Structure formats: structure tokens, C-alpha cells
Amino acid sequence: MFKSKTSTLSYDETPNSNEGDRNATPVNPKEKSQTKHLNIPGDRSRHSSIADSKRSSSRYDGGYSADIIPAQLRFIDNIDYGTRLRKTLHRNSVVSNGYNKLSENDRWYFDLFDRKYFENYLEEPTYIKIFKKKEGLEQFDRMFLAQELKIPDVYKSTTYQGEPAVANSELFKNSICCCTFSHDGKYMVIGCKDGSLHLWKVINSPVKRSEMGRSEKSVSASRANSLKIQRHLASISSHNGSISSNDLKPSDQFEGPSKQLHLYAPVFYSDVFRVFMEHALDILDANWSKNGFLITASMDKTAKLWHPERKYSLKTFVHPDFVTSAIFFPNDDRFIITGCLDHRCRLWSILDNEVSYAFDCKDLITSLTLSPPGGEYTIIGTFNGYIYVLLTHGLKFVSSFHVSDKSTQGTTKNSFHPSSEYGKVQHGPRITGLQCFFSKVDKNLRLIVTTNDSKIQIFDLNEKKPLELFKGFQSGSSRHRGQFLMMKNEPVVFTGSDDHWFYTWKMQSFNLSAEMNCTAPHRKKRLSGSMSLKGLLRIVSNKSTNDECLTETSNQSSSHTFTNSSKNVLQTQTVGSQAIKNNHYISFHAHNSPVTCASIAPDVAIKNLSLSNDLIFELTSQYFKEMGQNYSESKETCDNKPNHPVTETGGFSSNLSNVVNNVGTILITTDSQGLIRVFRTDILPEIRKKIIEKFHEYNLFHLEAAGKINNHNNDSILENRMDERSSTEDNEFSTTPPSNTHNSRPSHDFCELHPNNSPVISGMPSRASAIFKNSIFNKSNGSFISLKSRSESTSSTVFGPHDIPRVSTTYPKLKCDVCNGSNFECASKNPIAGGDSGFTCADCGTILNNFR
């Protein structure tokens, strides 16, 4: 299990409970860490500062510690993974008829790990402590560390023959500069400061997941053998050849496969898929094409073309200076666009290996992006804070502005260089990241600009005006890139930070125009702080009194409606002439070093992961499937039910086809020490409670069954008790007829499973059955019934975790003579019935001899 070394908070802790703690610690430790961890060239105390921050993290972070380990589970036996899987699947095929609507594909993983270990984890989960400032995003609730990947120190470039790196760079030779996923979601590429390029593959099949478990087990065994040999050699040298048994015993963490822990919810294979070593210096950018090719930009003045299935680069594009950006043309990946420090943006033809078009922007190019969806426009960011918009075809100039100079913003004049028009040259801030997205509200292109002055801004490229400003994170010399993503239909912007934290904001300007168009002009009542605009519009749309307003809004040809909407636009522009300052972020302490990159797994990567029997996906999808079945059944009987039982709680959707919602958020962060951390959202609290309840039923059932089997005198004792209970029930039900058959059931909770090949002794009354739930999560639709019989042999029966009695069947035409119950189950080959099928009462256990 994972637990923070300094935090013992539960998953449902709210920021209000730690308000005083957080108010005392959020500013001071961050300001202090920022002065420590700025990447100052030539600062030889950098390494010691990191060590000091690690030692003092638990003292100053107020419980927001990054000293965490990935969540792990323990397997239950010593047989290999494949054998255990085959045995479990075989047993499921045998007992599958004993389950009512329980998915056979979602039961096998309960046999793969220690249920007690997993139950302890479910009862006491310890999630990442997240700081929420004024508002939170449910997509990042219940976050835990799922996996850690490390860039090894052994990789060194063999092609670079230039001058050695400075001492400060050697401390961060494994620093990760870029991280991105392929379009098919199969690979994640990592570009490092030492020029190495690493490809990690997403787990996409159950077989590969099992192979991953076996490889981890073999590594553990080899480490145990190595430790045994070392102790053997040490004992020979210290004891003159005398060896004791304790000397050959490995440590407790390598005692064998039964003690081996495995990751709870890994995303990538533990071993890197491929490593490319052709770049000599820092890899600054990497981009995937729609056909699976990869282009990288490096400080060695080259851009290289790769493919995951090839061991070497396919082509090299030489530049006169550092290549800071490289990107594929979306509609045709035979062309790439690169940005260089020689002020020129180039469009290359890969087949011809030559420059087709070029544009000189008179400034150092530090970032580059294309407009969605077809890359019609090319947007360039420069060292001094200028933005250039070009037509991709021919790289023709369209417009430009400066991110902080308001005199260049919101103008209709599109000068070639803003400084030539206004007579001054701006110096900074440096643009470190760009991302363009299309606004479906006003049909305009919007640009996310990240600068090294710790700001992320959103610009409307049509008006060249800032719409929103995100603040809170810390940026120095790192190439932080604020990224926009729609998560559960909510616009989110996220980034890493030099203060070791991860930050994310909910975009407030995304639906700005939609709010202006949808707001009723005659409503003068102001919005309350507890009611959002979406919620107010939803209430208004549901009321019949607003039909006239809705009609006017939908009729675009009406002059009256157009006049009102124009007034709203003018009023909103007057109020919102300045950019929205958004500091309502949520964050958590992700690393003990500056966080260089942050990326959220795309939908295609999550879908690939769901194909590998991912535990979180299997449990969540099974839960919503059964909850949906219960709702559909209840809806048939009660059509006017106001509330839907399956809600989108914690960011998960009840739609079974929505695989992404069932898996949850997968966040990847990297730092300057070469560490890759994978964070995930855990299963819902409702799912945890259901699994814990089912585990308790399993444990009680098997404990009671095992105790009765091991007792040699148990059969005779039970026979006497059953005889006494049978006579008591005869007297009771003969005098007072029961009004409810459910209330007449005996109080016995559990019973043993009757094997199919075990004969039933004549004259032995059947014991009442146990009431089990229909499946892991939903409520019971009936009782699981089994016969309590005595076998002629004295051999004991071993119960598996899924050896549950069969489901009872209701026969309305039959009636019990003892309890007047109508629930019966079929007992095949009953000797009392002459070898034919017989029936027993599910309520009192009486054998029915009359079948008329």
C-alpha cells in the first residue's frame, strides 16, 4: 500500500479541516523553496539545496509531502501468474451457472491477490493531499501514486564529440525536457537533457500484464539469489568457511513470490520499450504524427525523424542553430515545421529533405504550434514575448502582438513587427509554451501562452486581447507549458512548477460568449455566490414561465432579440474589458525536485489500458453496469422516480460505453532528476464499500464452512439440531400460519456448499440456505441456496472464493406443507425421489415429496 511518510489524512479530508495549517504554510515554504530551486547557471549549491529541501519537506510542507511510494498489492500463492489465471478461469466456467447476472469476466482478479491485503487498503486508503484554493476539480479527487519510472544514469551519448558539459548541467543530465503521447495512445515519449529519447509503452493486453508480473517476480528472485551469494561469500571470509543456515537466508523483502508485492494500478510497462541515443544535446521538443512517426528538436542543431519500430532515426534535418520546436503538419505528415534560434521558421518537405518555405520573425523562436484542426495557421512564440500568426501555406504573415504590451493588443493594424509601428522594443517575458484551441462558442481561435514570469494567459487571436490570466505556479528557466484539456466536459488548464508542485485551474473564460448569449436581458436579479450560471440557466429553461424568453432567444431573425443581445455584449465587454484573473487553482506536492513536464493521458491511451484487465476499470464498469441494471428494473415498476441512482460521482460516468470515465484521470509528471510519476484517481467510495461488504461475506462464509468440515462430530450435532428445529417448526407453523414467507426463514446465516457428486442421505432434512448478494456490488435479487447434506466419505471439501451455492428458483404452483412457502430449489438425483429431480423448500428446508 501507499502511504505518505508525513501525512495520515484520509481521502475525504476537506481543505477546511486544515485551514489553519494551510494558511500558515502555503506561502512561506513555497517562497522559500523557490529561492532554493531556481536553476541558476553556475550555482554549485544547487545539489545541496535539493538535499536540504528533502530533509525539510516534512517540516515545512504542512503535510503536503512528496515522499510517497506507489500503491501495491500482494498475491496469494506461489504458483506463477499464468497457472493461477488458468485455474481461476476454469473454476469460473464450472460455477458460472451458480451466479445470477454476475459477469464472468469480472471475477477472476479476486483470485490473483491477497484479499485481506486488498481489504485493508480499501478500508484505510491514503490519497495525495491536495490543496484546493476556493474551488476544486472532482477529476483530481482520490489521487494516488500508481507507478514510478526512472531514467537510468548509464545512458550516455556516443555520437557527440563536442566540449563537455558544465558542472551544473552534469547534476541534471537526466532532467526531462518534454513528454507527450502518440496519437494512437500506445506510446509515451520522454526527451531528456542528455540527448536520450525514451519510449514507454502503455499496457494494452492481459497477457502482457501477466508477463509484466512474471518479469518483476524473476527480478526479485534474481536479487534474492544475488544477496544469498553475497552472504555466502561474506560468511566464508568471516567464519573461515563455516556456513550457517542464517547466512544463506535472504532478507525479508526477498523471501519468495508469496511475499512479493505488485503494483495496484500500473499504466506503463516497467521496462522502457526503446531508447534512442543519436542526439548529442538536450531534446527540447517532440511531436507525433497521425501515422505514428516522431519528430524531435534538439540543441545539437538538428531535428530527427523516428519510428517506434525502427532502432535508428530515419532522417536528420540540419539547422544553423538550436532547434527549439518541431511539429508535424496535421493534414499531411510528409511536412514538418521547425523553429530555430536563427529567427527563422521553416516548413520542410520530408521526402525532398529540403526547406519549402521559411519566415524570419526577427527574434529568437522559443515555441511553435499550429491551429486546430487542420493546421491552417502557424503561431510562433519568441524570446522577447512576441506572438506571430502565419498562414501555414507559404508561411505568410497575418498578425502579431506582444503578450504584455497592451498597445500592440486589440488593434486592427497588422504590422510586420510591432516594434516598428510603436517605436519601442520589448524585452521579455520569454514564451515557453503555446497551445491553440478552437472556441465553439464564438467560433474564434484562442491561444494559451505560457511565459517564464509565472503566468499563463489566454488570448483571442481574432481580437488579440487577453481573456484570462492564470497565476499561482512558479516558473524560472524551465520550459513549462500550460496545457488545455476538456475533462468531464469541463475546461481545465494544468502545468508543472519549479516549486515541486502540480497546478491546475478551471477555465472561466471558456463559455464567456455563451453566457452572454443565453442570459435573459430582462432579468435584473444578480447571481448568488452559491448558484452557478449553468445551474441558473438550467432552472430557467425548465420553467414554463420562461417560454417567451426562450422563444425570443431561439428566434435569431427578430430585431427585438438582436437589440437585447447587442446590449448584453456591450455591457459584458465593458465589465470584462480586462482579463479574468484566475488564481482558483488546486495543487499537490508531486516531486522533490522541480516539475518540468505535466501531461494527462489522452482518451485513446485510457482505452488501450482498459483492454488489459485494469483493476480500476473492471471494478468501476462492473459497479455502474449493475447499478444500471437495478435502475432499469426499478424504473419499470416506478416510472415517476425523481432521482437517478447512477450519478456522475467523483468524475465517473454511469455510461458503460464511456471507458474513459470508468478508468479515471491518469496524470504523468516528470522532474529535473529523471523521475517519472504516474498518478491516478482511485475507485469511488461507493465501490470501495461494496467490495468491502462482499469480502466480509466471503470471509464469513468460508470460515464457517471450513470450521464445520474440519469438525468430525459436526454432522451428528447438526443432524440433532436439524431434527429439533424441524419438530419445532412443525409445531409452530401448524398452529400459526405465516403471513410473510420471508419472516419465517430461520436465523442461520451461512451453509456449506453441496457438491454435485455427493449423494444426499435419505431422511436428512436440508438446512436453510444463506442469503448472498447477487454479485459484488448490487443488492440481492434472490437467495443463493444450497443443500446441507452429509457425504458418505469423510474427505473434506475445499472451498474456493467463488464456490457459492446455486440460486433458488421460485415455483408458484408448489406450496410447502410446513411453512406455506413457495420458494423451492431443484436437487438433482435425489435418492428419495427415486433418482429423479427433487425439490426442497428454500425457507424451511423441507423436502417436497408430492409434485402435484
From Swiss-Prot:
Q: Which residues form the signal peptide?
A: none
Say what happens when this gene is deleted: Increases cellular tolerance to 2-deoxy-glucose.
The family database entries (SUPFAM superfamilies) matched by this protein are listed as: WD40 repeat-like
Which keywords has UniProt assigned to this entry? Phosphoprotein, Repeat, WD repeat
Q: Where is this region: Disordered?
A: 1-60, 723-748
Q: Which family does it belong to?
A: Belongs to the WD repeat DGR2 family.
Recite the other comments: Present with 504 molecules/cell in log phase SD medium.
Identification of the protein by name: 2-deoxy-glucose resistant protein 2
Can you name the source organism?
Saccharomyces cerevisiae (strain ATCC 204508 / S288c) (Baker's yeast)
Q: What is the lineage of its organism?
A: Eukaryota, Fungi, Dikarya, Ascomycota, Saccharomycotina
